[in-house]
UniProtKB/Swiss-Prot annotation:
Keywords: Chlorophyll biosynthesis, Porphyrin biosynthesis, Transferase. It catalyses: 4 porphobilinogen + H2O = hydroxymethylbilane + 4 NH4(+). Binds 1 dipyrromethane group covalently. It comes from Chlorobium limicola (strain DSM 245 / NBRC 103803 / 6330). This is Porphobilinogen deaminase. Disulfide bonds: none annotated. It comes from the Bacteria. Pfam families: Porphobil_deam, Porphobil_deamC. Its EC number is 2.5.1.61. One of its GO terms (cellular component) is cytoplasm. GO terms for biological process: chlorophyll biosynthetic process; protoporphyrinogen IX biosynthetic process. The porphobilinogen subunits are added to the dipyrromethane group. The modification S-(dipyrrolylmethanemethyl)cysteine is found at C241.
Length: 313
């Protein structure tokens, strides 16, 4: 058994929360372990003057940490799973999917107004094409404004009065104790989350069996089934932060239900579908369900939507 572990993480407040949470959970199970954090600045932390969708680079928040993992300078990397590309570098693997927080998105607004009550032509801040597409389909009048930076930075920009509202993931807002700022939690019926939203992905080297065995204690089986289904769907659609794709899977008593959405950036075209599979006994079967739903979306015309978006990116 190893005596020491080094966790690689970004230095944002939310990333540090996630790394400290992982450290505390591992220490609870393995009190003899000496666990330290190594902070890594990523491309996504540096390039803050462009929308994520325009940068055109997969793994903006992960690949720099993965370089340290491959070089054996750290033993594991802790990521927001929604930031992790669906294909990991050779020699690396997502070993654990931690139990998921609430996957929904939230509205933070002036005066606590709900989405339906925001004024005509309201300025709504989000850096996500997925949110933009679904928002514009609900309210074509909204002016969508790009916003980058960590959660604290976004709240500062919002409080300075630049926007009428902004959209964030509930999980991050809750984890950093901003829950009292939430105006509305949006149901999946109107806003499907990002693939993997609310879960942490703990990445290790494939050949580091000792670390993998230690980290596997944090894996949450239901979350693994759900996230592998969602990630398989996204992989099959060849999507990322440049494509408006939302998905949400639930898994109970061997039955997986997966909802998915593909839309145009302007919200004028959107395709929704779902799949239910029963009797699942392995995460591989959940991935098969994700691929099957992706195929259905492509048959419905998702390929045309995605092709048009890629022409402009």
């Amino acid at each position: 058994m190893k005596k020491q572990l080094i966790i690689g993480t970004r230095s944002s407040p939310l990333a540090l929360w996630q790394a400290e949470f992982t450290k505390a959970e591992l220490s609870r199970h393995f009190p003899e372990l000496d666990i330290t954090l190594k902070l890594v600045k990523t491309t996504g932390d540096v390039l803050l003057d462009s929308p994520l969708s325009k940068i055109g680079d997969m793994g903006l928040f992960t690949k720099d940490i993965e370089k340290h993992l491959i070089a054996k300078e750290i033993d594991l990397a802790v990521h927001s799973l929604k930031d992790v590309p669906t294909s990991t570098p050779e020699g690396l693997i997502i070993t654990s999917f931690t139990e998921r927080e609430d996957t929904r998105d939230v509205i933070i607004s002036k005066g606590g107004a709900k989405l339906a009550d925001l004024p005509l032509n309201a300025k709504v801040a989000t850096s996500s094409l997925r949110r933009m597409s679904q928002l514009k389909s609900l309210r074509p009048d909204f002016e969508i404004c790009d916003i980058r930076g960590n959660l604290n930075t976004r709240f500062k920009k919002f409080d300075e009065g630049e926007f009428d509202a902004m959209m964030l993931a509930y999980a991050g807002v809750f984890r950093l104790n901003f829950s009292d700022r939430i105006s509305e939690i949006l149901p999946h019926e109107i806003m499907l989350p990002a693939v993997g939203q609310g879960a942490l992905g703990i990445e290790t080297r494939v050949d580091d069996e000792q670390t993998r065995e230690i980290v596997r204690i944090l894996n949450h089986s239901n979350t693994e089934y759900c996230c592998k289904a969602e990630r398989a769907l996204l992989r099959h659609l060849q999507g990322g932060c440049q494509i408006p794709i939302g998905a949400y899977a639930s898994f109970k008593n061997g039955t997986l239900k997966l909802l998915a959405f593909v839309g145009s950036v302007d919200g004028t075209v959107g395709i929704n579908n779902e799949i239910t599979r029963s009797g699942l006994t392995s995460p591989d079967q959940a991935e098969e369900a994700g691929i099957a739903l992706a195929e259905e979306l492509l048959k419905q015309g998702a390929d045309k939507i995605l092709s048009e978006i890629r022409k402009t990116r």
